[in-house]
Amino acid sequence: MPEINVMERGRELVVNPLVTCQPFGAMFATLGIRRGLPLVHGSQGCSTFVRYGLNRHFREPAEIAVTSLHEDAAVFGGRSNIINGVKNLVKRFRPDLVGIVTTCSSEIIGDDVDGFMRVAETELREELGDRFQTKLVHISTPSFVENHFRGYGNAIKSFIETLSREDGDCNHKLNIIPGIVNPGDIREIGHMLGLMDITPIILTDTSDPFDSPLRPSKTEQMPFYPPGGTAVPEIEDSSNSMGTLSLTMYGDEALNTLEKRFRVPGEYSMPIGVRNTDDFVRRAARISEKDVSDELLDERGILIDSMADLSSRYLFGRTAAVYGDPDMVAGISRFLCELGITPLHTCTGTDNELFIDRMKTVAAEADERINVMVKSDLRALEERLSEEPVDLMIGNSDGRLIAQDLGIPLVRVGYPVYDRVGYQRVPITGYRGAVNLLNRITNTVLREYYEPQHWKLQQ
């Protein structure tokens, strides 16, 4: 049986990284809460860098506050920074939730964030009385360990631990932990579940906050917030759901919390490609005790028909390199095998064991040996591609210069995509998303390998 060749970058220095620090993931998750604001307990750059990245990808503003730690706070602590920051946010913006996100600075100096948060709550209750309704959630995200995927998972876990309340009655809903995906993907998941008559609780829903028209507030007294997002009562009600499906491997701690504390079963399933989407649909149907609708079967049939039209003619026998988010890399790699493309090189900045297990499955199904680069970076991928080139690269915009230098066409997916527009609205999940991805891959192959010889297009 073919095996995977697991490789690490072999050096301490990271060049052109594939991951960033934990606070990014926590900020992203908090922005998916209706009238939610992240308050970053760190220096100004900790929020500026994230806002810049989100603006480039989504072309939308990201409201992120910061306690603005300076040299004095590094010595004497950031007590006043948190208390004043929370009070200013609550009084001026009246959010439903403030997620207090720690950074390397605040974690290293050992700030008692929970204690400072309680002081701020006490003072706000004294000043505002019943008008103080904001939920405060402490999210621990030390930047010097793990990555932004773990930061996202820590945020979801913190929301559940702080807010969820079990009332004993099942709400007949299905929790969905989407991970760091695009608005189009979240909407596609909602569409599929809607066809099965399943009501989801998205933990958390970043679709409308990052892709909606900006409208003024109805009254001058009501601060502006983007529409959509997961309401705080929905998070509180997540403990009464029938089950949870996580689209990210880093939703494991949130799944464990819901299962152990509230007896809500949880499973992992990322619906990219035919088999993975079949798996997602079956799990959702089993947990929710619902039937798969004819409309969903029709969407699957359209995907299979598209694959029959295109795979053997244009794609079979080609090779690809896939890099980025481990959930996306594993899902796309399996879909490539379904198309007859060998994912010869896969590269991610993490070393998640579930990712390695998934890639073993991909190698077995492809009947090919696959290079799986973990805890790696784009420099290592570039070196590998220089030695063993492929027909396609599939990943985010950070690999564009490598693709240009090596003359390999790049199919852009995931986060971030900043040198093309509209990609955040086009799903790659579900059956319809797989059709989108298939068309994108095929059109790239046609442009690169068929257009230079126009006679091939007539065959």
Curated annotation (Swiss-Prot):
It comes from the Archaea. The keyword Lyase does not apply. Its cofactor is [8Fe-7S] cluster. One of its GO terms (molecular function) is iron-sulfur cluster binding. The keyword Amino-acid biosynthesis does not apply. PROSITE patterns: NITROGENASE_1_1, NITROGENASE_1_2. InterPro entries: ChlB/BchB/BchZ, Nase/OxRdtase_comp1, Nase_comp1_CS. [8Fe-7S] cluster binds at residues 21, 46, 104, 143. Binds 1 [8Fe-7S] cluster per heterodimer. It catalyses: N2 + 8 reduced [2Fe-2S]-[ferredoxin] + 16 ATP + 16 H2O = H2 + 8 oxidized [2Fe-2S]-[ferredoxin] + 2 NH4(+) + 16 ADP + 16 phosphate + 6 H(+). GO terms for biological process: nitrogen fixation. Pfam families: Oxidored_nitro (PF00148). Keywords: ATP-binding, Iron, Iron-sulfur, Metal-binding, Nitrogen fixation, Nucleotide-binding, Oxidoreductase. Its EC number is 1.18.6.1. Belongs to the NifD/NifK/NifE/NifN family. PANTHER family: LIGHT-INDEPENDENT PROTOCHLOROPHYLLIDE REDUCTASE SUBUNIT B. This molybdenum-iron protein is part of the nitrogenase complex that catalyzes the key enzymatic reactions in nitrogen fixation. Tetramer of two alpha and two beta chains. Forms complex with the iron protein (nitrogenase component 2). This is Nitrogenase molybdenum-iron protein beta chain. It comes from Methanothermobacter marburgensis (strain ATCC BAA-927 / DSM 2133 / JCM 14651 / NBRC 100331 / OCM 82 / Marburg) (Methanobacterium thermoautotrophicum).
